[in-house]
């Protein structure tokens, strides 16, 4: 006879002899021949006893102890379409729906907006071509710029060296242009009754090239009150590390060679030199670059050093 039973929650203090049917050994071995209705009554009567059943205030569904829980008769019945002892086929049962599992509306997956591989590859090749053309055009411009100046201004072929050399070359040309400006002479002619008088500027009476010097640091003319007394007319202008020297002195033997060697010994790199002579005077227009480590950082320092060089040259020429 098939026995209908229900599995109740296990009492932690009860005796358990079977994993699937914990109360089978206590009640069902001796009552196999009884009527199923009597068996259910016996199970209900055993709730209040301590024979392995849950107490009358234990809620088997929620795991709580409550007095108002009443067992439903359908819960105590074994499925009638299955023989006793057979397992329930869980594989044939339908899977839980997504709505029940998720607890709400099923989420729609977002479709990623992915570009076509060919389009991405075309964009990459386009960027590479544009960057390649830009670099090619920049190299052409740098090559033209480098060809317009002497090679020692840009000894390396990188962009920073070429641009820096071009800036230095422009500064040197500016200094050279300032030194090559022609003197401005004014001649006024007064006519009187019986004689003509010609007046020239005080510069022409003091010597040639005197109008080349606007604000000299040293002067050998007594009329230059603003300049210190020196061995020659010396004027120095400076822009950053580039300096322009204008020197008007008397001719002396081997003066140019001694002047150039002495200037280079002061850690001044000679960039440009122009020599103009007239009568017994000579005008030197020199462009130099102050090297790192040089002690001459101002126009006053450079002018004083040049004046000292000319003084030494004059002393050597007087002894020879």
Curated annotation (Swiss-Prot):
The region called Disordered is annotated at: 30-121, 184-206
Query: SUPFAM superfamilies this protein is in?
Result: HLH, helix-loop-helix DNA-binding domain
Q: In which tissues is it expressed?
A: Expressed constitutively in roots, leaves, stems, and flowers.
Which InterPro entries would you find in this protein's record?
Answer: ACT_dom, bHLH-TF_ACT-like_plant, bHLH_dom, HLH_DNA-bd_sf
**What are the record keywords, sorted?**
DNA-binding, Nucleus, Transcription, Transcription regulation
Q: Where is the composition biased (Basic residues)?
A: 104-114
Q: Boundaries of each bHLH domain copy?
A: 122-173
Q: Which CDD domains match?
A: bHLH_AtFAMA_like
Q: Where are the transmembrane segments?
A: none
Q: Which Gene3D superfamilies match?
A: Helix-loop-helix DNA-binding domain (4.10.280.10)
According to the record, the signal peptide region is: none
- Predominant subcellular localization, coarse grouping: nucleus
A GO-annotated cellular component: nucleus
Give a yes or no for keyword Nucleus in this entry.
yes
A molecular-function term among this protein's GO annotations: DNA-binding transcription factor activity
**Keyword Aminoacyl-tRNA synthetase (UniProt):** no
Q: Where in the cell is it found?
A: Nucleus
Q: Where is the composition biased (Acidic residues)?
A: 65-76
Query: What region holds the ACT domain?
Result: 244-320
Database matches in PANTHER family: MAX DIMERIZATION, MAD, TRANSCRIPTION FACTOR BHLH96
What is its quaternary makeup? Homodimer.
Specify the protein name. Answer: Transcription factor bHLH96
Q: Which organism is it from?
A: Arabidopsis thaliana (Mouse-ear cress)
